[in-house]
Amino acid sequence: MKKNRIITVVLILVFLTGASLLLYPTVSNLWNSFHQSMAITEYTEQTEKLDRKTCERLWADAESYNKKLLDNPERFTMTDEQKTEYDQLLDLSGNGIMGYIEVPAIDCSLPISHGTDEAALHTAIGHLEGSSLPTGGKGTHCVLSGHRGLPSARLFTDLDELKEGDVFILKVLDRTMTYEVDQILTVDPYDLEPLEIDPEMDYCT
């Protein structure tokens, strides 16, 4: 009798372990989606509370930063001082969120975080340091990076479903910027040429 109980307990534990492993991706994705939605809601509420003067100053600082990038061939290699300046731009609450991206074709809405460290990329889309801040306008090339295929978060998993002509939207402070996909290519991490800034164009990669 005692032996049968032990076998039953072991079988239950094996079942629970298996069920936990099967449910982990779904539960984890739901949890991360909830926090992403909360981050976007919090960001939206904060921007709505901004007075016009503060909003204009934040935009002016970001646009000034972008102009400096045009004349900086070493912009992807930051000094500590430059990193500190970068982290403070478009950061309303000190949590590193500078806006959010919407991709209607794949029903995706995600916060955009400063930098592309692993902590940020597990829960948000990262903005590549050294690329233009998402202000739009000529002479800017904003580069965003996100994980695909993570078991714990959907993020950019469905990005390969996009096709030329689809649009995506960046929402930063009080502005909405809509971009159209004009080409799809794979960028080598060591080849920065596709990320160059064209003084006459407004790009987002």
Locate predicted features.
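N-terminal Lys/Arg-rich, disordered targeting/topogenic segments
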Residues: 1-3
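Solvent-exposed, non-transmembrane regions of membrane-associated and secreted proteins
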Residues: 5-9, 14-205
